[in-house]
A protein has these predicted regions:
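Conserved N-terminal entry element of GNAT/NAT acetyltransferase domains
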Residues: 20, 26-50, 183, 189
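Short amphipathic alpha-helix that is part of the acyltransferase structural core
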Residues: 40-68
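Conserved beta-strand in the GNAT
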Residues: 80, 85-94, 98-106
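A short, internal acetyl-CoA/4′-phosphopantetheine-binding micro-motif in the GNAT/acyltransferase core
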Residues: 105-112, 140
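Conserved active-site alpha-helix within GNAT-family acetyltransferase domains
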Residues: 118, 141-172
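Conserved GNAT acetyl-CoA-binding A-motif
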Residues: 128-140
Length: 189
């Protein structure tokens, strides 16, 4: 996950304002438990195609090339986890029958390490759950990120050699390390 937020808080407020103006399709709820603050419910909103580009600045934190995001944005489902602010967003595509892939997931930097990403992944797994279905996620070779996905029930699947070198127009870095190969993890649903 990249740090820094291009466009800052005002862009997030535009996206949040949009969330409350849209005619919402599927809405789900998750319960978040915070130490010392008890439990509370947060809404998960499925974003229609007409609103997806409003979240581009957040998507660019996790996948910093617009042309790569454009390849999957409108062929996937986008979900936002929110309460009074957007906490996390996710784009999931169907790659073939019963095979889904998280193409982009980002927790807003100031809300990271509070369980929002895990709750969103848990919701996504339940949303696409059917016997035989599989959920994939691809990421760079960052031990912190790999550990996060393993905690979410994923296991290593395969590697696409030189993915970041062959598909991005500039070097990609994660925690100071240049990304070369795409590591795929899978979770049986």
């Amino acid at each position: 996950m990249r740090s820094g937020l291009r466009g800052g808080a005002s862009h997030r407020h535009d996206a949040l304002r949009y969330l409350f103006e849209i005619e919402k399709g599927y809405n789900g709820f998750v319960t978040i438990t915070r130490k010392g603050k008890g439990k509370y419910r947060m809404e998960i909103v499925k974003i229609p195609d007409s609103g997806k580009t409003k979240f581009m600045e957040l998507l660019l934190i996790a996948d910093e090339q617009v042309s790569m995001i454009e390849k999957y944005l409108f062929r996937g489902d986008m979900f936002a986890l929110c309460d009074a602010d957007v906490k996390a967003i996710c784009v999931v595509t169907q790659e073939q029958s019963g095979v889904y892939e998280i193409k982009n997931i980002i927790t807003v930097p100031e809300y990271q390490r509070k369980g929002y990403g895990q709750r969103l992944i848990s919701f996504i797994a339940d949303y696409y759950k059917k016997p035989g279905n599989v959920l994939y996620v691809g990421t760079g070779d960052s031990p912190v990120i790999l550990h996060f996905y393993e905690k979410c029930g994923f296991e290593k699947s395969h590697i696409v050699k030189n993915f970041f070198l062959d598909n991005y127009d500039h070097p990609m870095y994660e925690n100071g390390q240049q990304l070369v190969d795409m590591i795929y993890l899978k979770r049986h649903l």
